Curated annotation (Swiss-Prot):
<keyword id="KW-0449">Lipoprotein</keyword>
<dbReference type="GO" id="GO:0006874">
    <property type="term" value="P:intracellular calcium ion homeostasis"/>
</dbReference>
<dbReference type="GO" id="GO:0007186">
    <property type="term" value="P:G protein-coupled receptor signaling pathway"/>
</dbReference>
<feature type="topological domain" description="Cytoplasmic">
    <location>
        <begin position="135"/>
        <end position="158"/>
    </location>
</feature>
<feature type="topological domain" description="Cytoplasmic">
    <location>
        <begin position="70"/>
        <end position="78"/>
    </location>
</feature>
<dbReference type="GO" id="GO:0005886">
    <property type="term" value="C:plasma membrane"/>
</dbReference>
<feature type="topological domain" description="Cytoplasmic">
    <location>
        <begin position="304"/>
        <end position="334"/>
    </location>
</feature>
<dbReference type="InterPro" id="IPR000276">
    <property type="entry name" value="GPCR_Rhodpsn"/>
</dbReference>
<keyword id="KW-0597">Phosphoprotein</keyword>
<dbReference type="Pfam" id="PF00001">
    <property type="entry name" value="7tm_1"/>
</dbReference>
<comment type="similarity">
    <text>Belongs to the G-protein coupled receptor 1 family.</text>
</comment>
<protein>
    <recommendedName>
        <fullName>G-protein coupled receptor 12</fullName>
    </recommendedName>
</protein>
<feature type="transmembrane region" description="Helical; Name=7">
    <location>
        <begin position="283"/>
        <end position="303"/>
    </location>
</feature>
<dbReference type="GO" id="GO:0005737">
    <property type="term" value="C:cytoplasm"/>
</dbReference>
<dbReference type="GO" id="GO:0019222">
    <property type="term" value="P:regulation of metabolic process"/>
</dbReference>
<keyword id="KW-1133">Transmembrane helix</keyword>
<feature type="transmembrane region" description="Helical; Name=1">
    <location>
        <begin position="49"/>
        <end position="69"/>
    </location>
</feature>
């Protein structure tokens, strides 16, 4: 009898296999009722744990923003509606990451895979579209500074919200409606069950929106520099003060756009060039920074906002600190 220690076809420990030798046959099979099948050990991918933890942090942060905007009647301006849309999208994205972890290890089925990927695609798409809508709102509020705050602006904001959530929902429904690779693995992208074509459309759409945001922020920088120069002339500020204020505004815009690109660009480019045959570690390594964007968004767009800070202080302690009530708005607050 030739025994190969490298092959274990039964899936049982080695001492159970050795019990099947002739000298141990009586001990190996005492009776039919005493045979116990061993259950396969559940192995959890550390990357999935990190993604689930990231989703939990995303949910906690953005839930606070959603509650603040919903609870405060004063936060009903178009800007806060768009910030609320961004927070809601990121909240759903974090929830999707948590559900994906639960379904992947407890309720594995084709239906749960499609529902989870649909939720994640729709929520992250809504998040990116909300960022673009916020950029458009900032540009228009500076370009039409005297006439932007009107009923017409509110209507335009609602139209943008309906369009971005409608488009994002359609993108999320594509895998559920049949555009997936569950039946043909050769068409899979780096994120199963998304097809390669589906991932390419999402990536190209992101690059288009990033280019549009870049162009808008360049125009915003020009407007901020012009406004800061006019304010300096009217109030007889020193050139140094004008330079510092303008530099702060441009630095803020560079931080916003740079963070967005650093988080999403690696996964976007990787989705275009890679497919399901590539090692999954590359997918995790590029997808994880994309989730960090939803962690950073509340800090950049919500918690830095003076009105949201006031509302948060009112909810938590019932008062507004003097530093917030006396702070003047400057051109760097864009």
């Amino acid at each position: 009898m030739n025994e190969d220690p490298k092959v274990n076809l039964s899936g049982l420990p080695r001492d159970c296999i050795e019990a099947g030798t002739p000298e141990n046959i009586s001990a190996a099979v005492p009776s039919q009722g005493s045979v116990v099948e061993s259950e396969p050990e559940l192995v959890v991918n550390p990357w999935d744990i990190v993604l689930c933890s990231s989703g939990t942090l995303i949910c906690c942060e953005n839930a606070v923003v959603v509650l603040i905007i919903f609870h405060s009647p004063s936060l009903r301006a178009p800007m806060f509606l768009l910030i609320g849309s961004l927070a809601l999208a990121d909240l759903l994205a974090g929830l999707g990451l948590i559900i994906n972890f639960v379904f992947a290890y407890l309720l594995q089925s084709e239906a749960t895979k499609l529902v989870t990927i649909g939720l994640i695609v729709a929520s992250f798409s809504a998040s990116v579209c909300s960022l673009l809508a916020i950029t458009v709102d900032r540009y228009l509020s500076l370009y039409y500074a005297l006439t932007y705050h009107s009923e017409r602006t509110v209507t335009f904001t609602y139209v943008m919200l309906v369009m971005l959530w409608g488009t994002s929902t359609c993108l999320g429904l594509l895998p559920v409606m049949g555009w997936n690779c569950l039946r043909d693995e050769s068409t899979c992208s780096v994120v199963r069950p998304l097809t390669k074509n589906n991932a390419a459309i999402l990536s190209i759409s992101f690059l288009f929106m990033f280019a549009l945001m870049l162009q808008l922020y360049i125009q915003i920088c020009k407007i901020v520099m012009r406004h800061a120069h006019q304010i300096a002339l009217q109030h007889h500020f020193l050139a140094t003060s004008h330079y510092v204020t303008t530099r702060k505004g441009i630095s803020t815009l560079a931080l916003i756009l740079g963070t967005f690109a650093a988080c999403w660009m690696p996964f976007t480019l990787y989705s275009l060039i890679a497919d399901y045959t590539y090692p999954s570690i590359y997918t995790y390594a590029t997808l994880l920074p994309a989730t960090y964007n939803s962690i950073i968004n509340p800090v950049i767009y919500a918690f830095r906002n003076q009105e949201i800070q006031k509302a948060l202080c009112l909810i938590c302690c019932g008062c507004i600190p003097n530093t917030l009530s006396q702070r003047a708005r400057s051109p760097s607050d864009v």
